[in-house]
Amino acid sequence: HFYHLGAVYDLEASAEAMEKANITGTKGALEFAEAVNAGCFHLVSSIAAAGLYRGTFTEDMFEEAEELEHPYHRTKHDSEAMVRANGRIPFRVYRPGAVLGHSQTGFIDKIDGPYYFFKALQKLRESWPRSIPLVGIEGGYINVVPVDFVVDALVHLSHQPKLDGRCFHLTDPKVRRVGETLNVFARAAHAPEMAFRLDPKVFAMVPEPVTQSVQRSKPIQNVFNQLLRDLQVPRSVLQFVNYPTRFDSTATQKILDKAKIRVPALEDYAWRLWDYWERHLDPDLSIDRSLRGAVKGKVVMITGG
């Protein structure tokens, strides 16, 4: 068995970095696997290989991917295409959803998906009374899975006979929207929830000239960009808030069910993810709050008699 997990999953990474890791790296891994006569090449791809497909993307779909303009989507799709077209070595492809921390410990060494909004939830908890309802957006679809499920599923599937050439969605069969998912984490964080969530279709009713005028407004853009910086939300993440794709994992679930490997309910372990993030990954933990840290890199004028 040869497992290839090396990739760039950072949405903020440059297109060149993604090309080098996701495409050039996969090419090198394939060549090495052939050189050592590996029995099967196991590619850990991503649901990103579907691009921004509108509808339900099944495990036997690949070429149907749509809107691969973002380099992350494109390089994940292209690396998968390379493995499929190789023809000289058996392969299996695994497409995990957005990978979260361990469902039993909360441990994670890289943030993805909902983690980008944890700082915003934390600030809301500190400044907004839970008794006052919030209005938010329902958003598109989001599929999240804990890392321990991904590992258990990968190990089991890779050792089952007669599955070469297949693709497996390591995803949550429960369909969730972004707004619903953020509310789960809001409860875990003891932050106010979005009592009212607006469907994205509501904004489609706004006349296009009005939308374009707002988007081009320099003052509005400046305020919006400052808000993103304060909440530490990468701008690139926002394009996925209305993610249009649902993922079907029926075939994979049938295999995993026999081994009693199932995706745990997010509600059951979200508190562990939040607790671990707040104790270990919160960016504010690394801020130097001493006098030295407060004045470092600044020009300070001391006045007085």
Specify the residue positions occupied by each region the protein language model found.
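Glycine-rich Rossmann NAD(P)(H)-binding loop
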Residues: V99-Q104, L134-Y141, R166-R176, V184-R187, ...
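Mid/C-terminal beta-alpha module of Rossmann-like enzyme folds, strongest
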Residues: H156-R235, K254
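Conserved catalytic Lys-bearing alpha helix of Rossmann-like short-chain dehydrogenase/reductases
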Residues: I23-A29, T75-V83, F117, V150
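Amphipathic terminal alpha-helices
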Residues: S236-V299
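NAD(P)-dependent short-chain dehydrogenase/reductase
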Residues: G55-T56, E69, R84-I142, V147-D152, ...
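Conserved Rossmann-fold NAD(P)-dependent oxidoreductase catalytic core, especially the SDR/UDP-sugar
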Residues: Y3-G6, E12-K20, T24-P71, F91-R92, ...
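Conserved N-terminal Rossmann-fold NAD(P)-binding element of oxidoreductases
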Residues: V300-G304
